[in-house]
Design a protein with these regions (language model features):
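Membrane-interface loop-to-helix entry segments
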Residues: 144-202, 254-258, 374-388, 404-411, ...
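A generic transmembrane alpha-helix motif of multi-pass inner-membrane proteins
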Residues: 409-547
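Extracellular loop-to-transmembrane helix junctions
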Residues: 12-13, 34-137, 257-263, 497-500
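Membrane-helix boundary/coupling elements in multi-pass transport proteins
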Residues: 38, 77, 100-118, 225, ...
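TM-loop-TM module centered on a large, flexible mid-protein loop between adjacent transmembrane helices
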Residues: 83-84, 89-90, 122-133, 205-214, ...
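Hydrophobic alpha-helical segments and their helix-loop junctions in multi-pass secondary transporters
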Residues: 118-125, 176-206, 269-276, 385-399, ...
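Membrane-interface "cap" regions at the ends of multi-pass membrane proteins
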Residues: 1-39, 43-51, 61-66, 77-78, ...
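Loop-to-transmembrane helix boundary motifs in multi-pass membrane proteins
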Residues: 141-150, 244-265, 269, 277, ...
């Protein structure tokens, strides 16, 4: 890792503290989640039970955050999931994961920037359709040109190229303003809202009633979509190389921001559902639309539009910081051109990665519809979190050259298969006693698999600084929830995921495997010892502190 870092030419400065990370985490998550995905998930998938969807997604994110935190504390370098998976499952798995995660970042940032156009229009009382124009001849979903979204992406790109500390200060200001608007929305929603809207649609003759109008399936489908809301904490972990005290600051920053944001999401979801029946919610601007539907409070929709605009800007800022650092570390490894890993000597930022991905994001935001982008994002995010949880278990129980990996790999495969069987039974088997029996039997089998592994296979690495509690139960629950939410997504999402993964495999075979910094002189790949790499990264961290 230290050898790879030298490719960048300069080190990133360690300037961030725990409060910076909490601010970056909150800023990165809240804007994208509440103001972009909530309307779609509530109107089309979950109804008022969207609050339960957020709670489930929040639990899943918190468990995944624990896994990220342990890795980030013991491997305090930029790169997040790519770095963690690279030192456990190897470069190929890391490349496929990293490629999908970067695509997730780019598409989610494009989606957020298009959401900014809708809320900015609400804030100043101008329909966003007046700022977008339709190009005939292009397919639906790709025929609305959004120049405002492009301008926002390019402006944020300039800010993150200027400096990380400066970006954090901008984020703190925007996040503080945003939180004030969030409190306004929550208070006004509970004050002006009608609890009957939690169970009664606006048009009961056309839409189902009740708090769970689409049943349990709708709750989990909604949870899968709003999981995009939590991608912000992952961006925080990518900045581990710029944190002053990773052991203390990263656990507080990552876990604290996820917990705070989950509470905010649930409160805002209840507030929105009380203000307006779910079938009358505007999918593109749900909170502004909810206040418009409240008699005498149309003015509040403009206030919400301003607050949402601040939130979307902070989300975009943090996510674009994260995507650039992923690309920087992937460039260090050599699997993509090392040009991407260049650190500017004056700003200490990965300027090439920031500029390239900023332009790529702007290009997608120019013409791609919000719904298309949201469906593309969720599956890749869930896959990456699933891989990190597996990698953490592997790193705790396997030391290459000392212990055999097959017992742990067999357990991970068997538990994933059991989780998949449970998911398929839940999704495909008709309701009834046979379904209940199969679900219970599968759950018992999954618990038995974990318990047998816990009793038979000893841990070979005990974390010295910070570790996930209740190993291997905590990451296993994370694995199960990620698999379950993956099963809630639609078929086209898997087609797109397969396409992107196929392209990534092709790039790896034709270029990356030969150019990698892991490649030996004969072109083969050397195998890294996990503990050795963790030790090497700690030595690098100490050297940076001495400088």
């Amino acid at each position: 890792m230290s050898r790879a870092a030298s490719v960048s030419g300069d080190q990133m400065r360690r300037t961030l503290r725990w409060y910076d990370l909490v601010g970056l985490g909150i800023g990165g998550m809240v804007g994208a989640g509440v103001f972009v995905t909530t309307g779609h998930a509530s109107r089309l998938l979950a109804g008022p039970s969207i609050v339960v969807s957020y709670a489930i997604a929040g639990l899943c994110a918190l468990l995944s955050a624990f896994c990220y935190t342990e890795f980030a504390v013991h491997l305090p370098v930029a790169g997040g999931a790519f770095s963690y998976i690279r030192v456990t499952f190897g470069e190929f798995a890391a490349f496929i994961t990293g490629a999908n995660l970067i695509m997730d970042y780019v598409m989610s940032n494009a989606a957020v920037s298009r959401g900014f156009t809708a809320y900015l229009g609400t804030a100043i009382g101008v329909s966003s359709s007046k700022w977008r124009f339709v190009v005939s001849g292009l397919p639906n979903g790709f025929n609305e040109i959004d120049l405002v979204a492009v301008a926002v992406v390019l402006a944020v790109t300039f800010i993150i190229c200027y400096g990380t500390r400066e970006s954090s200060k901008v984020n703190m200001v925007l996040t503080a303003l945003h939180i004030a608007f969030i409190v306004f929305v929550i208070v006004m929603g509970f004050w002006r809202g009608d609890p009957k809207n939690l169970t009664r649609p606006g048009k009961p003759e056309e839409h189902p009633s009740g708090f769970f109008p689409f049943g349990a399936a709708g709750v989990f489908n909604g949870a899968a979509m709003v999981y995009l809301s939590y991608i912000g904490y992952d961006a925080v972990s990518t900045m581990a190389e710029e944190v002053r005290d990773p052991v203390k600051d990263i656990p507080i920053g990552v876990s604290g921001s996820v917990a705070i944001v989950t509470v905010l999401y649930c409160l805002m979801a209840v507030s929105m559902s009380m203000l307006l029946p779910y079938d009358l919610i505007d999918p593109d601007a749900p909170f502004s639309g909810a206040f418009k539907g409240s008699d005498g409070w149309e003015w509040a929709s403009n206030v919400v539009g301003i607050g949402a605009s601040f939130g979307i800007l902070t989300s975009l800022l943090v996510a674009m910081l994260g995507q650039a650092r992923y690309m920087c570390v992937i460039g260090r490894s050599g699997v993509v051109p090392s040009w991407f890993s260049h650190i500017h000597p004056l700003t200490s930022t990965p300027v090439n990665s920031s500029a390239f991905l900023g332009i790529f994001t702007a290009a997608l935001a120019l013409f791609t519809d919000l719904n298309v982008l949201l469906n593309l994002v969720s599956i890749g995010t869930l896959f990456v979190f699933y891989m990190v949880a597996n990698a953490l278990i592997f790193s705790r129980y396997v030391q290459l050259g000392t212990t055999k990996p097959w017992p742990t790999l067999s357990f991970l495969c068997l538990f994933s298969i059991t989780s998949l069987v449970f998911t398929l039974v839940w999704k495909l088997v008709p309701p009834g006693q046979p379904k209940a029996f199969m679900l219970v039997a599968t759950a018992v089998a999954a618990i038995a698999v974990i318990q047998i592994f816990y009793c038979v296979v000893p841990q070979v690495r005990e974390p010295e600084l910070w570790g996930v509690p209740f190993m291997p139960w905590t990451p296993c629950v994370s694995i199960f929830l990620n698999v379950f939410l993956l099963g809630s997504l639609d078929g086209p999402s898997y087609v797109r995921f397969g396409f992107f993964s196929g392209v990534a495999v092709l790039v790896y075979v034709l270029y990356s495997v030969h150019a990698s910094s892991d490649a030996e002189g004969d072109g083969s790949l050397g195998v890294k010892d996990v503990v050795h790499v963790l030790k090497e990264s700690t030595e690098t961290e100490n050297a940076i502190h001495r400088v």
